[in-house]
Every structure is written in structure tokens, then in C-alpha cells.
Regions:
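Portal/gating segments that form or line small-molecule/metal binding sites
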Residues: 1-135, 145-204
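A contiguous pocket-lining binding segment that forms or flanks enzyme active sites
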Residues: 138
Length: 204
């Protein structure tokens, strides 16, 4: 079964919208390595339409320009790219296709194919649905030390909590935290009566 990972730039107050407006001051070699590791380990990239349009509007030109980011751009171009959208799309970036049918059903089929990892970058609406369906194996959050204070947040209002477990954590020189979470079983019921035993006792 294929592993599905999602990587997101996120502010301290949970904003994931328009990261290009606030995250570049924190981008360094550590973050570059983290992003490359997530996308580079996948042979398939799953996008929402807006994120795909952003990538397709930049990375083919960067590959053609032959600059220092050209190898990464080529790897993205060579990967299979699947775009989730309710609209009929004209996809011009090579190796791109539109996801057909229900997102959760289609991704379930993809997950069971005998290929490499599937990665998402951004694509918040897709990430939300895959988290809720428990199809996401790893959620990579690059938490920036800034409160953006406006914009869409990763988790929307819903009735059902999504329990997660921390797989790994590291801090970058810029103050960014690289947190990797995976799905967890539902937390047990507990109250303050259960918690108070763990409070530090004052010195007598």
C-alpha cells in the first residue's frame, strides 16, 4: 500500500492561506531539504486546482531556465500529477491528469496501487478531506514563528475531532518547527479528576 504524505507551510495561529506572502523570510537550507525530501520521495503528486495552477504557472518555466532549481523543477515535471477539481480542466504541464469521480474513492484506489509514495503540497481542501477519511499517512507541518492573524486555517469547523500522533519534530535555525504527524486512535475519555494526579506537587 502506498504512503500518502502532505506538506504545508503554516503560521503559529494555524493560517495556511497565501504562504508566499509571509513564509519566504524563513526559507533556508533546512526547509529546502525538508520540502525536497517530502516531494522527492513520491512518484505521484496530488493537487487541488488552485495549488496546481500555482505550480504549473511557475515550475515549467524554472525547469526551462536551467537555474539552480531546475533539477527540482524537472523532478516535479517528471512526476505523475493528479488534479482534484469539480471543473473540467485543460492541463498543459506534462504528466498531468484530472482525478475522476469522488475524491476519497479515487484516492483509495490510488493508495492501493503498486507504486511509490503519493505527496501533496498545499491543497488544503484535499488535505482536509483525506485527513477526515483517514487516508493520510503523514502530515508534515512547517510551523512558522509568525501569527498571520487572517486567512484560511488548516482545520475548519466540524463535529468530529481528528486525533493525531507526533512522529517526529525538529527545529530550524529560523525558529520554524518541522512537525510530522500521523493518524492516531481516538483519545480515551478523561476529566480533570484524571489529570490532576499529574500536576507537580509544591515543595513542603
Amino acid at each position: 500500500m502506498r504512503k500518502i504524505t502532505a506538506g504545508l507551510f503554516i503560521s503559529l495561529d494555524g493560517v495556511v492561506e497565501e504562504p508566499g506572502e509571509w513564509h519566504f523570510p524563513y526559507f533556508n537550507e533546512e526547509m529546502g531539504a525538508a520540502v525536497t525530501a517530502t516531494l522527492g520521495a513520491a512518484d505521484t503528486v496530488l493537487f487541488g486546482r488552485k495549488t496546481y495552477d500555482s505550480f504549473a504557472g511557475a515550475w515549467p518555466d524554472r525547469e526551462a531556465a536551467g537555474g539552480e532549481d531546475a533539477p527540482f523543477a524537472k523532478a516535479l515535471g517528471d512526476a505523475r500529477k493528479i488534479v482534484a477539481s469539480n471543473q473540467k480542466l485543460e492541463l498543459t504541464w506534462r504528466n498531468s491528469e484530472q482525478l475522476e469521480g469522488d475524491l476519497v474513492e479515487a484516492v483509495t484506489v490510488l493508495k492501493n496501487e503498486p507504486n511509490g509514495n503519493i505527496a501533496l503540497s498545499g491543497s488544503v481542501s484535499v488535505v482536509r478531506q483525506l485527513l477526515a477519511a483517514r487516508l493520510l499517512d503523514e502530515l508534515h507541518l512547517l510551523v512558522h514563528p509568525i501569527a498571520v492573524r487572517n486567512g484560511m486555517r488548516l482545520f475548519d469547523e466540524a463535529e468530529t475531532p481528528i486525533p493525531l500522533r507526533l512522529i517526529s519534530a525538529e527545529s530550524f535555525k529560523t525558529g520554524v518547527l518541522n512537525l510530522v504527524y500521523g493518524p492516531a486512535e481516538s483519545t480515551a475519555d478523561a476529566t480533570y479528576e484524571d489529570a490532576k494526579a499529574f500536576l507537580a506537587q509544591p515543595d513542603q
